[in-house]
Regions:
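Hydrophobic alpha-helical scaffolding
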Residues: 32, 61, 135, 169-176, ...
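Flexible, glycine/charged-enriched surface loops at secondary-structure junctions
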Residues: 5, 154-159, 192-196, 263-278
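Long, compositionally biased intrinsically disordered regions
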Residues: 253-343
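Short, electropositive alpha-helical surface patch
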Residues: 68-82, 142-145, 176-183, 219, ...
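Catalytic alpha/beta active-site cores
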Residues: 1-166, 171
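Hydrophobic alpha-helical bundle architecture
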Residues: 182-246, 264-271
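C-terminal helical cap(s) of enzyme catalytic domains, especially alpha/beta-barrels
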Residues: 95-105, 235-262
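Surface-exposed amphipathic alpha-helices with a cationic face
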Residues: 39-53, 179, 183-190, 258-261
Length: 343
C-alpha cells in the first residue's frame, strides 16, 4: 500500500517473559510473538512483496523488555531493519528493574549498532501519562540521555530513532505552533538522527473525521521539520485495531501531504521573538535545568521521584533484578570489543 516500514506489534505481555519463545506461533493477544522463526517468516514475506512492487520494505519489531540482547540478536540474524530499544521505557512502563534495564540496553544496543539496525526510543509514551505541554522538556531530556547511552554503546547517530510525539490537546490555542516548535527544536538538536515521530493518540476521540484532520496536521509538522520515521496515525484510533482500509487512508494522507508540502521547510523561516522560537527556547532551557539537576542527583533518584512520565519506580523494585550480578575480576565479554570495534 506504500509504507516504507512495517512494524509488527508484539503480543501483550512478552516484555515480561524472561525467556524468548521458540518457533512459529499461530496466536497472540494484541500482537504477534517475537520469535526468531516469526522474524524469518515476516522478513521472507516482505521480501516477496518487495519483489512484486519493486522496492525494499523495512521490518520493525521490539527488543524491549526482559530479553533485550536476546531479541536484538534474533533481529540481527533475521535481517530486521528497525527495533524498539529504549533505555528507560521498560523501567517506566513495564516495571522492569532499572539496574537490569540499563545493563541490558547497553549490550543490546551494541548488537543493534553492529548489525546496522536503527533503534527507536519511546519518549512518546511519556506524553500519554503526562501533559504534552508541561512535560515537553522531559521528552527532550530523555532524548539526550538515550543519545548518550547509545553513543556509549557505539551506535552511530544515523541509527538513532530518538522519539517524540504530536500529543497536545487539539483544543489548545496555537497548539500547532507549539508542536511545530517541539519538532523543529528536536531536529536541530539532533541533526543526524533518524527521528521517530509519533502520531496523536491521547486526544483521539473516535470521531474519524476530526482524527483524520489531527493526523494531517501531524503529517504537516513531520514534512515541515524533516522528521526521520513518521509513524502513521489511524482515523479509527480509540475505536478498534485498524483495518487494512484504515492503514490505506493513513498512507494516502501522508503521501499527499509529503508530496504537496515537500520543500516547505526550505522556504519558511521562524520569526525572532515569535511563538515558535520562544517556545523552543523555553523547552530547551527547562531540559538543561532538569539535566543539571540529574547530574547532581543521579538518574536512579530521578526515576524514583517520577520525573519522567510522572511514573515513580524503585531502584530495587520491579522485575528482573535477580538476573543482575556484579562483574567478577575475571569477567570478560569478548563480543563487546569485537562489535564496537567494527565502528
Amino acid at each position: 500500500q506504500g509504507a516504507d516500514i512495517i512494524a509488527v506489534i508484539r503480543t501483550t505481555g512478552q516484555s515480561l517473559l524472561d525467556y524468548v519463545p521458540y518457533g512459529a506461533t499461530t496466536e497472540g493477544f494484541g500482537g504477534t510473538f517475537a520469535t526468531q522463526e516469526n522474524f524469518r517468516i515476516m522478513r521472507t514475506a516482505l521480501d516477496k512483496v518487495g519483489e512484486d512492487v519493486g522496492r525494499y520494505i523495512r521490518l520493525c519489531n521490539y527488543c524491549s523488555g526482559l530479553c533485550m540482547p536476546e531479541i536484538a540478536i534474533m533481529g540481527a540474524f533475521e535481517g530486521l531493519d528497525v527495533m524498539l530499544n529504549d533505555a528507560l521505557y521498560g523501567i517506566l512502563f513495564r516495571d522492569i528493574n532499572m539496574q537490569r534495564t540499563l545493563v541490558d540496553q547497553y549490550f543490546s544496543r551494541i548488537i543493534n549498532g553492529f548489525a546496522g539496525v536503527i533503534i527507536n526510543t519511546g519518549e512518546d509514551n511519556y506524553l500519554t501519562t503526562a501533559d504534552a505541554v508541561e512535560a515537553a522538556h522531559t521528552v527532550l531530556a530523555s532524548d539526550l540521555i538515550n543519545e548518550q547511552l547509545a553513543l556509549l554503546a557505539g551506535l552511530p547517530q544515523e541509527q538513532m530513532g530518538l522519539g517524540h510525539a504530536f500529543e497536545m490537546d487539539p483544543a489548545l490555542e496555537n497548539g500547532f505552533l507549539l508542536e511545530l516548535a517541539q519538532a523543529q527544536m528536536t531536529r536541530e538538536i539532533f541533526p543526524k538522527a533518524t527521528l521517530k515521530y509519533m502520531p496523536p493518540t491521547k486526544f483521539m476521540t473516535g470521531n474519524i473525521f476530526k482524527g483524520h484532520l489531527q493526523d494531517a496536521l501531524f503529517n504537516m509538522v513531520g514534512i515541515w521539520t524533516n522528521q526521520g520515521i513518521q509513524l502513521l496515525g489511524m482515523p479509527t484510533e480509540a475505536i478498534h485495531t485498524p483495518f487494512m482500509s484504515d492503514r490505506f487512508l493513513a498512507i494516502e494522507n501522508a503521501k499527499y501531504i509529503f508530496s504537496n508540502m515537500k520543500n516547505i521547510g526550505d522556504e519558511m523561516e521562524f520569526k525572532e521573538g515569535g511563538i515558535i522560537k520562544t517556545r523552543a527556547k523555553e523547552v530547551l532551557n527547562n531540559a538543561i535545568e532538569l539535566l543539571q539537576k540529574l547530574t547532581s542527583e543521579g538518574l536512579f533518584n530521578a526515576l524514583e521521584k517520577g520525573i519522567f512520565g510522572d511514573v515513580k519506580r524503585s531502584r530495587t523494585g520491579g522485575k528482573g533484578l535477580s538476573g543482575v550480578v556484579a562483574k567478577g575480576s575475571n569477567y570478560m565479554n569478548p563480543f563487546i570489543n569485537l562489535m564496537k570495534g567494527r565502528k
